[in-house]
């Protein structure tokens, strides 16, 4: 998980997160569903900005040419994430899914002798949301 930052007042604060999206983008729709299903908004506040409005599009098009685009203000620095890097950034904030019925957590000793929990690997043939999104993106790129 991304660490939160300490402000000058000594209080912990979270990054400022703005997500630019379009209702016409399949990747945006998948990302919005992922954010909802993963419980990410339980961890960080996100401002969702739709760029389908012509006025909004003209304002943001100078800096943002692709959606989804994520602008994060953290530690007095602004970062722009696009395409797969948006998914990867959000993946750090997702709530781990509950274990499926019959799933177990195995403990294995690390190099220093401490035991570390290792979840059982997912069943073959099942894709994570990130893998599914990457696959969909590749298929769309091949079609164009």
Swiss-Prot record:
In residue numbers, the region (Disordered) covers 98-127
Report the InterPro entries cross-referenced here: Thioredoxin-like_sf
Taxonomically, the superkingdom here is: Viruses
Quote the CDD domains the UniProt record gives: TRX_superfamily
Q: What is this protein called?
A: uncharacterized protein 030L
Origin species: Invertebrate iridescent virus 3
